[in-house]
Amino acid sequence: MAESFKTGLRRPRNIARVSDLHARAADFLARQARLLEQRLYATLFEGASAAGVVEALRGYQNEDGGFGHGLEPDKRCPASQPLDVQVALETLVAAGTSDAAMLQRACDHLAAVGPDGGVPCVLPSIAAYPRADHWGDGDFPPGLNPTAAIAGLLHALGVDHPWVDTATDFCWRELDREVPHDAHGLAVTFGFLEHVPDRQRAEALAGPAAAQLPEAEWYLADADAEGYGLTPLAFAPTPDSRWRQLFDDAQIEAHLDRLERDQQADGGWPVTWEPPSEASRLEWRGIVTLGALRTLTAYGRLR
């Protein structure tokens, strides 16, 4: 990355304005966010121990070792869901912490759900509970999404469990068959390729995967685009992200400008899809607001 680019990112145009942006976002999190996002904010921005994040996550872990209870808020189902395991792992990585017993139990659960390595995003158990329309009846096949994300995160956390190897083999088989053509599939693939131990194989697939992104479904290359999708900042949330090189400086700057503009009057950021309830919407807004703060701070737009 060019030094001039790094310098430019770390000189906010209006420090008073962006500091106010942060203060209003922090107020929104204090008023509206879940305990989990509040504890993660305290860890990332206030120097609090990551132990608080782990303790908040425990409330979502079930006796079977999986995570549920709407940890991913688009379904209000208490039963364990693979996608909720992914969110738990993402939270631990974000907090820079781990919990061996929690992770071993989660892997035991994943092995029971996907003994051949692959798991679906959600299970049919969600059908008995309120959920976003895109989850339908919860009948999904095992796939790269979310298996690749989960496997990559477990590698990032250094988890040693037989299922991690089984899931890794599943992901390689799927990627050898076909590289995803949608933004969600590419996002989880990138996460897997970033952390999987076989670096030679990962680097060989990085180029073909990256080549799919410009035309991928649900990818929003244009910072002025409206509606739901993943922007370049979803793939490169920090300047030193592995996939930052896929985007030019002007594109990143434009999306950072848009991210700043999208803050709402109440201090939070909006969601661009329809959650199953107002409670779910607020939970999601806490998640995306914290994500916006993390990205804007990483790129030098906030302090």
Q: Regions from the language model: what does each represent?
A:
Residues 2-303:
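Preference for long, amphipathic alpha-helical scaffolds in soluble/luminal domains
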